[in-house]
Amino acid sequence: MGSFSIWHWLIVLLIVVMVFGTKKLKNIGSDLGGAVKGFKDGMKDGASTDDSATTSAPAGQVTNNSAAADKTTIDVEAKHKS
């Protein structure tokens, strides 16, 4: 009762093809494929820029030591944002 048989899905597919037509479905498929390809390329580009950023300086490491020489600066880590 909760699952549909293959015949139910074939009837639904036939109705969708009759309503939208094959040309419209082909255009939707190619648009969706282009969007997925663009998303994958974007993720690949984002991963390569993140890798180059992490190799240049590790997160949390201070590269400028002028603050350590200044005795009036207090270095603390905030636990809660008020």
Swiss-Prot record:
GO terms of biological process kind: protein transport by the Tat complex
Transmembrane region(s): 1-21
Cellular component GO terms held in the UniProt record: TAT protein transport complex
Subunit architecture: The Tat system comprises two distinct complexes: a TatABC complex, containing multiple copies of TatA, TatB and TatC subunits, and a separate TatA complex, containing only TatA subunits. Substrates initially bind to the TatABC complex, which probably triggers association of the separate TatA complex to form the active translocon.
Compartments in which it is found: Cell inner membrane
Keywords attached to this entry: Cell inner membrane, Cell membrane, Membrane, Protein transport, Translocation, Transmembrane, Transmembrane helix, Transport
Membrane topology listed for this record: Single-pass membrane protein
Full protein name: Sec-independent protein translocase protein TatA
Source organism per UniProt: Acidovorax ebreus (strain TPSY)
Compositionally biased intervals (Basic and acidic residues): 72-82
Pfam families the record matches: TatA_B_E (PF02416)
Record carries keyword Cell membrane: yes
